Amino acid sequence: MLVTHIFLLTLSLSVPTLGQYEHWLYYPEYQASQAPEPLPTPARNVPQIHVRLAGEKRKHNEGRVEVYYEGEWGTVCDDDFSMYAAHIVCRELGYQDAVSWSPSSKYGKGEGRIWLDNVNCNGREKSIASCGSNGWGVTDCKHSEDVGVQCSDRRIPGFKVSNELPGQLEGLNIQVEEVRIRAILSAYRKRVPVTEGFVEVKVQGSWRQVCNAEWSSKNSRVVCGMFGFPAEKKFNNKVYKLFSSRRKHTYWQFSANCTGNEAHLSSCKVGGVLTPDPKTNQTCSDGSPAVVSCTPGRAFAPSPGTGFGKAFRQEQPLVRLRGGANTGEGRVEVLKNGEWGTICDDKWNLVTASVVCRELGFGSAKEALAGAQMGQGMGHIHMSEIQCNGFEKSLIDCKFNVHSQGCNHEEDAAVRCNVPAMGFENQVRLSGGRHPTEGRVEVLMERNGTLRWGTVCSDTWGTMEAMIVCRQLGLGFASHAFQETWYWQGDINADDVVMSGVKCSGTEMSLAHCRHDGANINCPRGGGRFAAGVSCVETAPDLVLNAALVEQTTYLEDRPMFMLQCAHEEQCLSSSADRTSPTTGYRRLLRFSSQIHNNGQADFRPKTGRHSWIWHDCHRHYHSMEVFTHYDLLSLNGTKVAEGHKASFCLEDSECETDVQKQYACANFGEQGITVGCWDVYRHDIDCQWVDITDVAPGDYFFQVIINPNQEVAESDYTNNIMKCRCRYDGHRIWMYNCHIGGSYSTETEEKFEHFSGLMNNQLSTR
């Protein structure tokens, strides 16, 4: 059974649909303080009003504050507005409290009257109409000062809506606490996810069916989208009519009227009030409960053996998500001319974001994120000012501006999509930790015909496996993967090892999807103190190499051996250097500069603490990571042909963006790492910043750099840790070309890169 929360609909048949209303920016300076408990206020002449959230939506529970007074909707000025006032607005809409408020029409400018100015609340009022103000319609503000709020997701239990306004809005103040798809037919009751059944809404604590008399396929599309499904499909209505005729139903007294492009049922208009039949007193005497049947995306369709119907099959997508911790979220990237690039967040909203989600096989968008909240991309910004109507099959079918002047990667758009409830979070738990985001990993597995909780063998346990656990639990990224957990007292009834040999690729949605030994448990060290553990965090770093700089700075140097004593000691040279004369010999070095950016949402810190760092006498500083980057020269079949290069590193902030302060430095035993928005530079002329190619024959090669190769430190994206170039060496000169980051090309373009036989420019011709 699927359940989700939606918010108060305050609507009129004569006013515009709420689908066009909403908000976007988040202001930390107006972040939520704890909301005061509402207390009874002295009785006075307080007018009855309605409140709604308007503007371009990036989340359904935020927007420009609009008030319905004396038959007209109007806005509220931001002068003297406070978190107390924001709490009152959200409570009036049925939410427990506010998260933040935003001034200066950040949700867009409203129209018509500005009803309230200089609003002064103490946090205990029942309505914003009870707060102090200049009086109704008394203001010197313009709509550029319209205020907006963001409410929490938590609803007030049993919240009752006032229906005391006369006129057209009478009876249309509907509170829908939750909505669900309740599987009715036996064929769907045990299936995960639930894709077909009655649409039911929870009103004042009771579940009620929705009458199908005014139900449309557009309504079904919205409901399916809320539950993580990209589309609706037809179903056998005769079976449901037969079932309904044998049951007594309690109906919701209203109908919904959706356009089909809403990201949430809360954005639909109320269609009308269902009048009870005078004879039967039933509100849906000529109908039956509304039914939806949804098509799941490919990743969520049950296996063919279950007899499941057809699943939604999207074509090869021209859009992808990167940098998100959970399935269905990430920075939006689009493919153009064989190269992936980002999109600018100008005009980015829920409707447009929902097109992306559905294109990828998810439901509608839960949240449209602006300001690179899923990390910054690299390369081109392919699209900006995108405007969709919500029914496009692909983002590229929407109207957009191909020019991105004024945009930078700090404005990269991202999305969180609604995904089906698969129940994966119920199959794993963390036990014994100091807080809910850490602990010994315990999994629910079938052993000897029964389901039982047990531990995971840590012999093959690493960061990638820990990442899957954190994703499965919805806890973000893994900050650490522990192979010993003796300090965490787990459940004594779950001490036995029930899973071993776990190896994950990083794309799985649950630990059970990773390769493992199944029922053949093989754990030489046993469980107990060697059971696997994790620690999860909300954000992670993302290291990316500047590929263009590598291509621009590459050159060869013949360096005498007597100048390479320190490098020789640190094994930065090929093993043949041991046989080279220290006085007359030399080494041929492929030199280049590297610039490693942290484009993520958290600082990159070494895995080990300062007590484990190694002092390098030649360089006169500590190296915090012995294996931070690999520099490799490969033959065209992928064989390594050169050895001798920099291995251990000291990590620091060499340079930063203008608004970012340096935090890490190698000097004076300082803290090491790379701050978000900073980069660590290794110039071409520093010791060991090379590959020793003395023994390499002339020919065509691949040059490859891999950052964090052992994945010792968790990152939001490992695909961009690899940089690869084509390379031609004629015995005297070297050419580096087509340098690019892993994942920046389409599959087809990458294959052409792998098989391209020569360099096409005025220096060397194609063979």
From Swiss-Prot:
What kind of modification does the protein receive after translation? The lysine tyrosylquinone cross-link (LTQ) is generated by condensation of the epsilon-amino group of a lysine with a topaquinone produced by oxidation of tyrosine.
Localization terms from the record:
Secreted, Extracellular space, Extracellular matrix, Basement membrane; Nucleus; Chromosome; Endoplasmic reticulum
Q: Which EC numbers characterise this protein's activity in its record?
A: 1.4.3.13
Q: Which residues are glycosylated?
A: 281, 448, 637
Gene name, per UniProt, is loxl2
> Which cysteine pairs are joined by S-S bonds?
77-141, 90-151, 121-131, 211-284, 224-294, 258-268, 344-407, 357-417, 388-398, 457-523, 470-536, 504-514, 566-618, 572-688, 650-666, 656-678, 725-739
Cofactor info, note text: Contains 1 lysine tyrosylquinone.
Q: Does the keyword Transcription regulation apply?
A: yes
Provide this UniProt record's keywords sorted from A to Z. Basement membrane, Calcium, Chromatin regulator, Chromosome, Copper, Disulfide bond, Endoplasmic reticulum, Extracellular matrix, Glycoprotein, LTQ, Metal-binding, Nucleus, Oxidoreductase, Repeat, Repressor, Secreted, Signal, TPQ, Transcription, Transcription regulation
Gene Ontology MF, one? copper ion binding
Any one annotated GO CC term? endoplasmic reticulum
Entry's Gene Ontology BP terms: collagen fibril organization; endothelial cell migration; endothelial cell proliferation; epithelial to mesenchymal transition; heterochromatin organization; negative regulation of DNA-templated transcription; negative regulation of stem cell population maintenance; negative regulation of transcription by RNA polymerase II
Predominant location category: secreted
Q: In which residues is Ca(2+) bound?
A: 542-543, 715, 717, 720-721
Q: Which residues form the signal peptide?
A: 1-19
Among InterPro entries, the record links this protein to: LOX-like_protein, Lysyl_oxidase, Lysyl_oxidase_CS, SRCR, SRCR-like_dom_sf
* Origin species: Xenopus tropicalis
Cross-linked sites for Lysine tyrosylquinone (Lys-Tyr) = 646-682
Reaction catalysed by this enzyme: L-lysyl-[protein] + O2 + H2O = (S)-2-amino-6-oxohexanoyl-[protein] + H2O2 + NH4(+)
Q: What is this protein called?
A: Lysyl oxidase homolog 2
Where do the annotations place Cu cation binding? 619, 621, 623
Query: Which PROSITE patterns does this UniProt record tie to the protein?
Result: LYSYL_OXIDASE, SRCR_1, SRCR_2
